[in-house]
């Protein structure tokens, strides 16, 4: 037989495109359209329906300046039609070729203000019952920003302009031909399946012949009348069951809705309502759909802003078909959030689902975050969560991850059962190509037989469609295809763990994403706002709890809850990483300022109450380490400053413990550890280095390895001066200026640095370097509740790919007997390189990433003034590094008043190995005191708690403060902790 595959394929493509799909909706009447262009920001629906100034509007008319809202009123009459006709409006707001969720969208309302249905580019129909049509469409003119990576002013309403972006292309009353629609699905599923089969596979030829027969049976002059004959020709090939060994795919309806990204937070509120409305309609009409939605924040937005949609969602949740997943407040970044913030994502997320729906979510759901902290498995497990899902590691730039289903082991040894969907998408459409790729790509064949595939339009929302569900029904048991079952994620995980749990491989350590490494640095103000807010929250909880226990001052549960949720929202994986539009980051800065002001009010009130006033100064120390005579977590008079810093020409600072030499270029050329008798530096330190930064794509997200060869040192000096114990250096480069300060305080075992940058560069990357005279091939980096060790060599492609990494407050390099730490107050990006050392051996160049200047999606990223603080700590062991990180981020607060005893003393062995991360009152309002501690050194430790208030009992709890079956508390409030173990202790007050 001659090979006519291409002829058949081309014939089918034209048939679907030019004849069948357009014929599914037959126009029977037009609609009258009126429009009201909302001035400014969106208004509540009730206000629009009651007070909108609607004027006649032509189909084809222009509407929608960027970020504007236009309300359309659609009226008309359905003509007489045969009984059983399915009448639908088809509305085209002017869709473009971009994906749904990245352009105009709409939400349809009835005249009484109730929500009817969402409108998206591939979900443009509205069901109609009755003869009269009277509906309103709230249309959002969201601009298409993801169009290459070119700089755009569309990312902020203040700069986006007023020119309309869209034209109303269509508003029709139609009759949907169900027979033709079903034929389209039959043809498409079979054609896509055949395209993925091997060329010599008999099944493919069988399908090809069936497609030819079906097209022969179809009369273009009577498509509707001949559709059944065409379907009959396809029936036998659609009826063939899948092979017994066919891979099994759990298809989960889903819409990945970024809580902010290329749109502001206020638009996400509306996106969630549109998608949830569409999904609710599908659940009503398609009993085979199961839909999963993450992010408690998005449910809360529905509850607050669209309560009628929330009520429908809640009904489907109770039926088990609208499934909350993830157990987090938002799908956050997991690299940069601090210890408590990462825990509170699960506390607030899981508690919301428990309180609203009585549901304990079991699967952590983070398909799109930019790598996953090695501390996460323990945090996940301590929240009562059992499984973990992501897809993002498939984006790796260099190495292909070796597993799709495996146990993930964290820094403390906790393991969680983990799955990466091998379809390599969280926005699946259940196409033949996706399913075939999932099967071919699956790395665990032979031992495991199943995988998960989230399907539905996402990123900007949209969700599953009836077309996707039609495909799923045909793919449930079809020869040549994997078996597709639409199920809840928990069904997949339970079956996968039962099948493969005992044999699944183990991955130890972080799930590092070999991409998007610049997200540790972009949008410095957002990152600084986050870091400051996290530490102010710690202080507020500590001092408010202390004031409540000591003085009976009411504990501000509600205010702290509000502030925590605000901070958690802004840790979303496109806000904290700095990869959103200008609008998002401008608002984030204002929000962080408001959060800080509210927290300062709480802190100052609690501190004033505790201090009680008086003539003498008292310093409050929120750090878990005693400091300058002030106890950890308490307050005492500050000690008199002792010691002398001598300053000599050259410039040289000497406090008897360290001697720091600064040359005429303002560089630190020597840090002599007078106690250890050794030089700390192997070359000039505090050296600013400016890189060209022109990533291949994803400007705000990426820094590519070639940036390292495009570097110049910033060592020109415009002014150098000395004031007291501080050296000040002014520099200028490009369009920017820098003021650096170097301070050696009396009695200090560290050198403090402050750099103020007035930054006006484009596509540049500024780092500060310290060549440390330490020979090692690894470095330690702080993460949540501990630290991890990474190689600093490039022996393998996995090592080389980690050329930019994330750390929290400190990084440390060490050789046996001596270490050096570099602590910071707001920086996350780091790199550590090994370089030859004069005299032999190697040194370690430790660099902090300070500021970037990408142009997409925010063309003005990081322009303006920034202040960074960091400290070099010679002779540092891990405890010294941990202490320096806390002290730099939790400065003493000095007021007038009396000393305050800590609520609890923690005495550990080894000394200071057990760190108090949080002191607060219990969330249930009982007044119990909750302490969260962790082992910080990576070894075993014993800690004794000594409360300074009457305690009726103590229990270990999970992160949600529920008693655990296994209790780490021994007699006498003694804790025995394994390496990096987190323990939450509830102290019940008498």
PLM regions and their residue ranges:
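Extended extracellular/luminal ectodomain segments enriched in beta-structured repeat modules
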Residues: 79-89, 748-749, 926
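Histidine-centered catalytic/metal-binding microenvironments
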Residues: 1-42, 162-263, 534-642, 919-920, ...
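Catalytic grooves of carbohydrate-active enzymes
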Residues: 188-219, 256, 260, 414-611, ...
């Amino acid at each position: 037989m001659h090979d006519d595959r291409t002829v058949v394929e081309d014939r089918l493509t034209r048939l679907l495109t030019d004849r069948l799909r357009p014929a599914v909706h037959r126009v029977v009447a037009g609609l009258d359209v009126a429009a009201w262009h909302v001035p400014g920001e969106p208004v509540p629906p009730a206000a629009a329906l009651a007070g909108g100034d609607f004027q006649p509007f032509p189909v084809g008319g222009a509407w929608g300046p960027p970020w504007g809202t236009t309300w359309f009123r659609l009226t008309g009459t359905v003509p007489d039609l045969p009984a059983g006709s399915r009448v639908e409006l088809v509305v085209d707001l002017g869709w473009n070729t971009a994906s749904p969720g990245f352009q105009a969208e709409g939400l349809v309302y009835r005249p009484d203000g109730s929500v009817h249905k969402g409108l998206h580019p591939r979900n443009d129909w509205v069901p109609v019952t009755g003869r009269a049509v009277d509906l309103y469409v709230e249309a959002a003119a969201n601009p298409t920003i993801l169009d290459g990576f070119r700089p755009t002013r569309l990312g902020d309403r203040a700069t986006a302009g007023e020119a309309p972006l869209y034209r109303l292309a269509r508003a029709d009353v139609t009759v949907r031909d169900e027979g033709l629609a079903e034929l389209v699905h039959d043809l498409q599923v079979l054609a896509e399946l055949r395209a993925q089969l091997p060329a010599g596979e008999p099944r493919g030829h069988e399908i090809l012949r069936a497609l030819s027969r079906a097209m022969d049976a179809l009369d273009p002059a009577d498509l509707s009348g001949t559709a059944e004959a065409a379907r009959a020709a396809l029936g036998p090939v659609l009826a063939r069951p899948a092979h017994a060994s066919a891979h099994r795919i759990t298809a989960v309806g889903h819409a990945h809705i970024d809580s902010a990204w290329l749109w502001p937070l206020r638009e996400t509120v509306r996106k969630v309502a549109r998608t949830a409305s569409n999904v609710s309609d599908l659940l009503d009409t398609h009993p085979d759909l199961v839909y999963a939605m993450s992010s408690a924040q998005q449910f809360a937005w529905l509850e607050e802003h669209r309560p009628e949609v929330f009520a429908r969602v809640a009904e489907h949740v109770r039926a088990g078909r609208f499934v909350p997943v993830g157990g987090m407040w938002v799908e956050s970044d997991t690299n940069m959030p601090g210890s408590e913030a990462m825990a509170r994502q699960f506390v607030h997320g899981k508690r919301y689902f428990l309180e609203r729906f009585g549901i304990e979510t079991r699967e952590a759901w983070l398909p799109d975050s930019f790598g996953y902290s090695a501390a996460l498995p323990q945090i996940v497990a301590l929240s009562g969560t059992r499984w973990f899902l992501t897809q993002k590691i498939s984006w790796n730039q260099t190495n292909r991850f070796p597993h799709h289903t495996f146990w993930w082991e964290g820094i403390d040894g906790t393991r969680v059962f983990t799955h990466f969907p091998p379809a390599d998408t969280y926005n699946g459409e259940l196409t033949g190509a996706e399913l075939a790729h999932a099967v071919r790509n699956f790395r665990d064949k032979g031992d495991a037989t199943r995988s998960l595939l989230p399907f539905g339009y996402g990123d900007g929302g949209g969700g599953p469609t009836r077309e996707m569900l039609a495909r799923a029904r045909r793919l449930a048991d079809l020869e040549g295809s994997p078996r597709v079952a639409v199920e809840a994620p928990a069904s997949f995980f339970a079956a996968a763990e039962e099948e493969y749990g005992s044999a699944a491989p183990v991955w130890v350590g972080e799930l590092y994403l070999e991409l998007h490494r610049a997200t540790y640095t972009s949008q410095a103000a957002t990152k600084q706002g986050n870091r400051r807010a996290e530490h102010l929250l710690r202080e507020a909880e500590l001092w408010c709890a202390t004031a409540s226990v000591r003085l009976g001052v009411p504990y501000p549960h509600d205010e702290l809850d509000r502030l925590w949720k605000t901070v958690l929202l802004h840790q979303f994986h496109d806000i904290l990483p700095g990869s959103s539009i200008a609008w998002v980051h401008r608002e984030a800065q204002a929000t962080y300022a408001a959060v800080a002001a509210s927290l300062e009010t709480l802190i100052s009130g609690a501190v004033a109450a505790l201090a009680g006033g008086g003539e003498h100064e008292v310093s409050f120390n929120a750090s878990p380490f005693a400091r300058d005579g002030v106890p950890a977590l308490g307050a005492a008079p500050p000690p008199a400053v002792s010691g002398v810093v001598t300053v000599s020409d050259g410039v040289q600072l000497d406090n008897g413990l360290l001697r720091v030499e600064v040359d005429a270029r303002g560089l630190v050329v020597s840090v002599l550890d007078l106690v250890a008798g050794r030089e700390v530096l192997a070359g000039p330190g505090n050296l600013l280095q400016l890189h060209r930064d022109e990533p291949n794509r994803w400007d705000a997200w990426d820094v590519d390895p070639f940036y390292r060869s495009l570097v110049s040192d910033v060592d020109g000096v415009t002014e150098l001066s000395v004031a007291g114990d501080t050296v000040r250096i002014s520099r200028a480069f490009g369009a920017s200026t820098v003021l650096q300060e170097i301070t050696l305080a009396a009695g200090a075992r560290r050198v403090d640095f402050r750099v103020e940058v007035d930054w006006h560069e484009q596509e540049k990357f500024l780092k500060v370097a310290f060549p440390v005279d330490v020979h090692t091939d690894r470095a330690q980096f702080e993460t949540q509740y501990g630290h991890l060790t990474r190689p600093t060599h490039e022996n393998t492609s996995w090592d080389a790919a980690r050329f930019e990494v994330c750390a929290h407050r400190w990084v440390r390099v060490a050789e046996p007997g001596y270490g050096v730490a570099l602590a910071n107050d707001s920086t996350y990006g780091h790199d550590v390189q090994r370089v030859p050392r004069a005299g032999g051996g190697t040194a370690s160049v430790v660099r902090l990433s300070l500021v970037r200047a990408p142009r997409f999606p925010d063309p003005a990223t990081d322009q303006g003034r920034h202040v960074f603080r960091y400290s070099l700590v010679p002779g540092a062991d891990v405890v010294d590094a941990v202490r320096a990180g806390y002290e730099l981020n939790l400065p003493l607060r000095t007021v007038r008043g009396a000393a305050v005893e800590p609520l609890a003393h923690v005495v550990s062995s080894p000394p200071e190995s057990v760190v108090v991360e949080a002191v607060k009152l219990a969330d249930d309002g009982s007044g119990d005191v909750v302490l969260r501690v962790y082992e910080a050194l990576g070894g075993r430790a014993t800690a004794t708690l000594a409360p300074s208030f009457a305690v009726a009992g103590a229990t270990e709890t999970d992160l949600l403060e529920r008693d655990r079956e296994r209790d780490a508390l021994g007699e006498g409030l003694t804790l025995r902790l394994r390496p990096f173990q987190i323990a939450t202790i509830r102290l019940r007050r008498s």
